[in-house]
Amino acid sequence: MASIILESIFLKRSQQKKKTSPLNFKKRLFLLTESKLSYYEYDFERGRRGSKKGSVDIEKITCVETVVPENNPPPERQVPKKGEDYNMEQISIIERFPYPFQVVYDEGPLYVFSPTEELRKRWIHQLKSVIRYNSDLVQKYHPCFWIDGQYLCCSQTAKNAMGCKILESRNGSLKAGRSHRKTKKPLPPTPEEDTMVMKPLPPEPAPSAAGEMKKVVALYNYVPMNVQDLQLQKGEDYLILEESHLPWWKARDKNGREGYIPSNYVTATSNSLEIYEWYSKNITRSQAEQLLKQEGKEGGFIVRDSTSKTGKYTVSVYAKSAVDPQGMIRHYVVCCTPQNQYYLAEKHLFNTIPELITYHQHNSAGLISRLKYPVSRHQKSAPSTAGLGYGSWEIDPKDLTFLKELGTGQFGVVKYGKWRGQYNVAIKMIREGSMSEDEFIDEAKVMMNLSHEKLVQLYGVCTKQRPIFIITEYMANGCLLNFLRETQRRFQPAELLEMCKDVCEAMEYLESKQFLHRDLAARNCLVNDQGIVKVSDFGLSRYVLDDEYTSSMGSKFPVRWSPPEVLLYSKFSSKSDVWSFGVLMWEVYSLGKMPYERFNNSETTEHVIQGLRLYRPQQASERVYAIMYSCWHEKAEERPTFSALLGSIVDITDEEP
């Protein structure tokens, strides 16, 4: 699938291709790629794309411009009056699309209405960029709508009639006033473009004492979100100018442009297996087998890290079998000679792993099948960035569009929405009096720099109005607790263990940053549309003002997830998070049961202090229960670290070859 440049929800006017066609307006999800402008139905309840309703080939577009607004439009297409933009809490769906623009192509104008002027500008700019080399660009356009069989601006009755107004700025590569030429060749660059291309590159910074400047390759495309960002093109190389422990690095591209990039979008060129479709970094043997069987294709294969042999790789291959209807799977360790050559079959040596894979894609050479079809856990979608652009932590509420309410949490209502009409976000609307706001705002910048693939990313805050908003990554499948209770299927033990592993990876990261969660539980973990579990609300319990929540004697205090030292002395540490993780594992394996379900909070406190521990859930093996139980040692110092717990969880997975 082509890379998506822009994605937004707009109001689309019907094109009335037939004289009898009705004039109507419908909300559609628009996607822009290098080759097509497409629009789809949109499921506002689930936040998902529906069926495709139409598309326009980019090469057929002749003009993109604004349209003069209608006279006396209905409320949904009226520009909000001053002050209305800030009444955000009352909006649960996109209600207004007052900013029209037109995309003109061989079948006439396509009229689109944007919810904000800024979003309209962005789309017009990007559309003009992708059509700039089109051969049929026009230099006159119709500034007003086509209605009732004619253009309101000039009364011409032919839909494809020449425009009546000269474009103020040149359209694409042509200049205003220049005769129209039908040629498929791109026009030569203008003097301004020539100057830009020929501008000499700035000198490379001097190498550091440690050696040469770091070079990286982009794993994903990245479209800049602000002026300080640098665009990334998947597969392109970049030079790192400033590297830090923070999630944004300053980089330079091959054309000399400089800016900030998300560090989790690139990898060192010397370690670039991640750019290959066949490589899955964090996947276990049992997960690989499950995926290969689901795909069921002869020669399906996965290259993955070996969990039992650090630094080694394993190739898992599927082949059909007359004996077993589910097929058979073999796992081959990628071996390395003393001369650093790789092989699966000793007679065939290669200098790199990609060369080895390429060879076996054409030759089985001792394998049960040649490597025909790369299989992955999911399409490698781009990860979340730490903030919506470099240095952007204060978000303008006018850039937010509210789509639906997700629920109510400790701090107030949570809604699903879009940032600048394009990026899915969750918006926590903080109820006044529920949070120590000033203290949280001071800490928000620090929390934004916590970035890990198994943490729900904090994008930013809106603090210049009340209520304040916390903007985070959107997780389509909601909280883990409800996911466990409501999913209408039986979870396999490997799936439950993977959920625990996801959480443990996030907690190991927080542990390494000396950051405490303080309220780890299934209700505070979320599940995305790919079934990956991420830890949410880390550290937020410090800012709760409700005594019923902050006091260990309060009715809302998480007694059932708390160790004795917290219940007795309110003593929090990484080891109190470890205790909570053990209870979370119990929740997962009991499919969302309430811990200590037969006792109230005060009884639970008494029993925990006296040494009572949760029983082994039916779905948990003895080895899994041993990990849970190790988290509940009375002495905090005797509990394992999250790093040790992660190692134990990995060890439980099927033995590696």
Swiss-Prot record:
Localisation per UniProt entry: Cytoplasm; Cell membrane; Nucleus; Membrane raft
Residue ranges of domain Protein kinase in the record: 400-653
Superkingdom field: Eukaryota
Modified positions (N-acetylalanine) in chain numbering: A2
Activity regulation, per record: Activated by phosphorylation.
Entry text on domains: The PH domain mediates the binding to inositol polyphosphate and phosphoinositides, leading to its targeting to the plasma membrane. It is extended in the BTK kinase family by a region designated the TH (Tec homology) domain, which consists of about 80 residues preceding the SH3 domain.
Protein name in UniProt: Tyrosine-protein kinase BTK
Lineage: Eukaryota, Metazoa, Chordata, Craniata, Vertebrata
